[in-house]
Amino acid sequence: MTTWTPDPDFWRDRPVTVTGATGFLGSHLTAELVALGAMVTVLVRDDVPPTSISAAWLPHVRKVRGAVEDQAILERLFGEYESKTVFHLAAQSQVGAANRNPVATYEANIAGTWAVMEAARRSPRIEQLVTASSDKAYGAQPVLPYDEDMPLAAVNPYDVSKACSDLLSQSYHQTYDVPVSITRCGNFFGPGDLNWERIVPGTCRSLIRGEAPVIRSDGTMVRDYLHVVDGANAYLRLVESMHDDPGLAGEAFNFSTETPLTVLELVDRLQAAAGTDLEAEVLGTASHEIDSQYLSAEKARKVLGWEPTISMDDALANTIEWYRTHLADDDR
């Protein structure tokens, strides 16, 4: 694993906007930006309890309240705060929630993206814009791993919403020369994720409490997992590369550790990190999900020089320890 650090001279005093800053990836990315000295403005829709990650940066950012679908608010935000770099992360990010409420998902993920794109089109100060797509946008493919030349063949509601967001971003670059690039990542994990419905947080909490981990699928689904710090650094690396080579606008990049795991394999690795040996409760109730999906990060390695900095085993051990401390603090 290699070590890469962002260029503080590039980020210092740079006007940056982050949508979705209070989300899991967004909170880590915003923490990095604040530490680098960027002038960060965040778009916030709802009041959510701060995590230990977001609590550290909340006093140091400018907050604009509004929905990401509100183009007028975005135009005011980009203009008033003279945004040069925009990270568009705001989305409804839960597959199960998307299946239960597709309309709200389409409004947030599709209408939200076209509002960001149109506001960016009308905001000539913006030099780099990054849209968060997903490995889910590829849909079920006959050959794996996914690479960036594969068509976006999403079918299920969440997957379609991310594919549409991806294509909208490409369209605004091709048609209007909006300087946008696209990230396609797998499942983020690491410190600060308190969504217990997700497999890593839920499993960590169960193991620490001595309870059987619960798997809602049959455990054989293959997925891509990326530590959130490596994910945040991927976004920073992409923007710095876009600054050095504006020709990267319009490109999509996969970011991955290239270590695909079944859900059962992931749980076994978490048990090894936690020092437990509990039999998982396999529910087999997951539906409308793709059996196997994982990414090739070859393009990101070759074009951007990006590589993950944390091995999978170290990342899982780091994550277990964070939850152990967090849950101990909650019990006091």
Where in this protein do the model-derived segments appear?
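C-terminal substrate-binding subdomain of Rossmann-fold SDR/epimerase-dehydratase oxidoreductases
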Residues: 35-38, 207-332
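Solvent-exposed, non-membrane alpha-helical residues enriched in polar/charged side chains
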Residues: 75, 79, 117, 170, ...
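A glycine/serine/threonine-rich, flexible loop-to-helix segment
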Residues: 144, 195-202, 270
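N-terminal Rossmann-like NAD(P)+-binding domain of SDR-like oxidoreductases, especially those catalyzing
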Residues: 1-186
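Active-site loop immediately N-terminal to the catalytic Tyr-X3-Lys motif
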Residues: 102, 192-196
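The catalytic Tyr-centered alpha-helix of NAD(P)H-dependent dehydrogenases
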Residues: 154-161, 196-200, 224-228
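Radical SAM [4Fe-4S] cluster-binding motif and immediate context
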Residues: 189
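Hydrophobic alpha-helix immediately C-terminal to the catalytic Tyr-X-X-X-Lys motif of short-chain
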Residues: 164, 168, 172, 203, ...
